[in-house]
Amino acid sequence: MVPLCQVEVLYFAKSAEITGVRSETISVPQEIKALQLWKEIETRHPGLADVRNQIIFAVRQEYVELGDQLLVLQPGDEIAVIPPISGG
């Protein structure tokens, strides 16, 4: 069994509006695919499904595609959910 670790999820702009928080700590498997990590977050905040195809997902300040990429997380890692920023 893969051990769990606690990571901090940071929400920006529209994702913060949807979740109602700017950050939270969650417990997830230390080894997890990027898409599965997103699904864990989406389960907590179903409204994020509306922006899933628009967000930028970053782990330890590195962009990650929501796919089968295996992530090896460490306790305290930061996961950022960044929707597109509009403006002019």
From Swiss-Prot:
<keyword id="KW-0225">Disease variant</keyword>
<protein>
    <recommendedName>
        <fullName>Molybdopterin synthase sulfur carrier subunit</fullName>
    </recommendedName>
</protein>
<feature type="modified residue" description="1-thioglycine; alternate">
    <location>
        <position position="88"/>
    </location>
</feature>
<dbReference type="InterPro" id="IPR016155">
    <property type="entry name" value="Mopterin_synth/thiamin_S_b"/>
</dbReference>
<dbReference type="Pfam" id="PF02597">
    <property type="entry name" value="ThiS"/>
</dbReference>
<keyword id="KW-0597">Phosphoprotein</keyword>
<dbReference type="GO" id="GO:1990140">
    <property type="term" value="C:molybdopterin synthase complex"/>
</dbReference>
<dbReference type="InterPro" id="IPR003749">
    <property type="entry name" value="ThiS/MoaD-like"/>
</dbReference>
<keyword id="KW-0547">Nucleotide-binding</keyword>
<dbReference type="InterPro" id="IPR028887">
    <property type="entry name" value="MOCS2A_euk"/>
</dbReference>
<dbReference type="InterPro" id="IPR044672">
    <property type="entry name" value="MOCS2A"/>
</dbReference>
<keyword id="KW-0501">Molybdenum cofactor biosynthesis</keyword>
<feature type="modified residue" description="Glycyl adenylate; alternate">
    <location>
        <position position="88"/>
    </location>
</feature>
<dbReference type="GO" id="GO:0030366">
    <property type="term" value="F:molybdopterin synthase activity"/>
</dbReference>
<keyword id="KW-0963">Cytoplasm</keyword>
<dbReference type="InterPro" id="IPR012675">
    <property type="entry name" value="Beta-grasp_dom_sf"/>
</dbReference>
<comment type="similarity">
    <text>Belongs to the MoaD family. MOCS2A subfamily.</text>
</comment>
<dbReference type="GO" id="GO:0000166">
    <property type="term" value="F:nucleotide binding"/>
</dbReference>
<comment type="subunit">
    <text>Heterotetramer; composed of 2 small (MOCS2A) and 2 large (MOCS2B) subunits.</text>
</comment>
<dbReference type="GO" id="GO:0006777">
    <property type="term" value="P:Mo-molybdopterin cofactor biosynthetic process"/>
</dbReference>
<comment type="function">
    <text>Acts as a sulfur carrier required for molybdopterin biosynthesis. Component of the molybdopterin synthase complex that catalyzes the conversion of precursor Z into molybdopterin by mediating the incorporation of 2 sulfur atoms into precursor Z to generate a dithiolene group. In the complex, serves as sulfur donor by being thiocarboxylated (-COSH) at its C-terminus by MOCS3. After interaction with MOCS2B, the sulfur is then transferred to precursor Z to form molybdopterin.</text>
</comment>
<dbReference type="GO" id="GO:0005829">
    <property type="term" value="C:cytosol"/>
</dbReference>
<comment type="pathway">
    <text>Cofactor biosynthesis; molybdopterin biosynthesis.</text>
</comment>
